[in-house]
A protein has these predicted regions:
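Gly/Gly-Pro-rich "capping" loops immediately C-terminal to redox-active cysteine motifs
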Residues: 19-22, 31, 45-79, 88-102
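Sequence context surrounding c-type heme c attachment/ligation sites in exported
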Residues: 26-41, 54-55, 108-114
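The canonical Cys-X-X-Cys-His
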Residues: 28, 36-47, 73, 119, ...
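Glycine-rich, acidic and aromatic/proline-enriched surface loops and short helix-turn segments
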Residues: 37, 79-83
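C-terminal capping alpha-helices of c-type cytochrome domains
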Residues: 75, 92-127
Length: 127
């Protein structure tokens, strides 16, 4: 069963919050910068002067809020394969359709709905 059953989708967007509420940008920034939780900076770079090593495999996050709506950011966080089937970005809020998942992680998402909304709220501020 999909975790997103009942959510409306636009072509490249999930317009509605996964939780029904706005996320917290400060918590979202902490998730993006945390190398144990989001791992975003493994591939992305952005406005994180305190982080020495940032990725160069994926787009810079500096102006992501100017390039995408909150719904478009949310879709890319939930499962960017819906937008780009060739992406290497993990699906942060899907729990099905993966190969070779360790037993402890089966049926679980990388981030919770609340964490997704926090990251969306933060990334939307990057203009």
């Amino acid at each position: 069963m999909s975790l997103l059953a009942g959510n409306a989708f636009a072509a490249d967007s999930i317009p509605a919050s996964l939780t029904g509420a706005k996320g917290d940008p400060a918590r979202g920034r902490a998730i993006v910068a945390n190398r144990q939780v989001g791992l975003c900076l493994l591939c992305h770079s952005g406005p994180f002067p305190e982080e020495r090593f940032q990725g160069n495999l994926a787009p810079d996050l500096t102006s992501v809020g100017a390039r995408y709506s909150e719904g478009q950011i949310r879709q890319r966080m939930v499962d960017s394969r819906k937008v780009n089937p060739q992406t290497i970005m993990p699906a942060y809020y899907e729990s099905e359709g993966f190969a070779r998942v360790a037993p402890a992680y089966r049926g679980k998402t990388i981030l919770s709905a609340e964490q997704i909304e926090d990251v969306v709220a933060y990334l939307a501020t990057l203009r």
